């Protein structure tokens, strides 16, 4: 649901959290709905190549009910919570498959977190009660520390999931990811899922079937050379023009490499260069090869070139359209063995795909 005055905020939220350019949304969305039932009527009029399933999302409902108070993450009043619960119940009757919310502070927009990030059990429980009254429906959320449940937070997030499952009489799924800071933590998280499930609640980890990656290139938000002094002189050019300038000017190429070396960022992690099992993979016109021997580190070792020089050559390839594939999660061991083990566990479910929402982050 969206109030007419709130349309721009939802666009900005989608741009910042889902990486969809605002211009694409503004030019492609027909704002011919306000309520969730009206939204369902709107999308049912289209012709699609795939069947569409819809969740009712907490952030939009909160902003619809509370306006700017909701956007600023002020606490919900009992009346606010009751109205949100009414809307969620109505949405389930109208065809929503489930309810979703986010507590991760990785999801930001404008100068703050998206609506609902700070919401706790007091706000969510009335919604869970409404879900139970409608016969139950899956609940999904991104927990605090979406990159992995950090020890200081994971038990509280899992207890929140258990309480919502208990109240809603429904399964609750939360993101479960292998992250490089602690590649084994997912095992203890699954143990906690098992422990709470023994009390009769249904809590599952939602696992993506692949690594979660960011793509870096000349026209993406991130690349290894963007923080150097010379990049602003190139960023307004087309990919082809950038590649031509770099390839025809050895001095510029060397300055870009030197600038990247002096402005360390995530692309220059020692792990990428020195650990051959954690590949930063070049992407070109052919299908990507995710084997460690195709990583930037491996190419650098074979050719005796600076890894940043190899990266720059990759980005200049294919007329400036070359890309680097940076695996954030589920690839800490250089393979998908952890994903395989997660998916074999009875307290996991396959999911967590962004389905094309992010333009530069793939899961």
Locate each region found by the language model.
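Divalent-metal coordination cores built from histidine and acidic residues
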Residues: 1-98, 134
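Hard-cation-handling environments
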Residues: 196, 200, 204-330, 346
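C-terminal substrate/ligand-recognition segments
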Residues: 311, 331-363
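Glycine-rich tight-turn/loop motif centered on a GG-T
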Residues: 9-28, 32, 69-79, 110-120, ...
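Structural motif
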Residues: 50-54, 97-98, 137-139, 171-173, ...
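Generic recognition of flexible, low-complexity loop/linker segments
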Residues: 87-88, 127, 161-162, 192-193, ...
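Functional cores that coordinate and move charged inorganic groups
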Residues: 73-74, 88-227
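Divalent metal-coordination and catalytic microenvironments
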Residues: 52, 95, 206, 304, ...
């Amino acid at each position: 649901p969206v109030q007419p005055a709130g349309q721009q905020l939802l666009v900005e939220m989608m741009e910042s959290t889902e990486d969809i350019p605002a211009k694409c949304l503004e030019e492609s969305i027909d704002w011919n709905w306000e309520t969730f039932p009206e939204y369902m009527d709107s999308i049912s009029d289209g012709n699609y190549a795939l069947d569409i399933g819809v969740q009712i999302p907490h952030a939009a409902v909160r902003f619809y009910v509370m306006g700017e108070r909701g956007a600023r993450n002020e606490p919900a009043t009992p009346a606010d919570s009751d109205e949100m619960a009414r809307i969620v119940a109505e949405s389930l009757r109208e065809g929503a498959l489930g309810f979703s919310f986010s507590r991760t502070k990785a999801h930001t927009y404008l100068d703050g977190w998206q609506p609902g990030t700070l919401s706790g059990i007091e706000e969510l429980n009335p919604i869970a009660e409404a879900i139970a009254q409608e016969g139950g429906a899956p609940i999904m959320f991104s927990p605090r520390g979406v990159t992995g449940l950090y020890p200081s937070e994971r038990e509280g997030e899992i207890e929140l999931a258990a309480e919502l499952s208990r109240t809603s009489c429904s399964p609750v799924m939360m993101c479960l990811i292998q992250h490089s800071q602690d590649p084994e933590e997912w095992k203890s998280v699954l143990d906690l899922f098992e422990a709470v499930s023994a009390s009769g609640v249904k809590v599952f980890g939602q696992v993506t079937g692949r690594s979660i990656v960011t793509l870096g290139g000349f026209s993406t938000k991130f690349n290894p050379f963007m923080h150097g002094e010379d990049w602003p002189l190139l960023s307004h050019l087309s990919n082809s023009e950038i590649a031509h300038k770099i390839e025809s000017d050895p001095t510029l190429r060397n300055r870009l490499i030197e600038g990247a070396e002096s402005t360390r960022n995530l692309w220059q992690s020692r792990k990428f260069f020195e650990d051959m099992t954690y590949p930063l993979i070049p992407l070109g016109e052919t299908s990507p090869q995710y084997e460690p021997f195709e990583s930037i580190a491996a190419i650098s070792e074979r050719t005796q070139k600076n890894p940043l020089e190899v990266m720059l050559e990759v980005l200049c390839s294919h007329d400036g359209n070359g890309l680097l594939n940076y695996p954030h999660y589920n690839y800490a061991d250089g393979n998908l063995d952890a994903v395989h083990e997660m998916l074999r566990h009875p307290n996991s479910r396959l999911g967590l795909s962004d389905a094309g929402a992010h333009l530069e982050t793939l899961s």
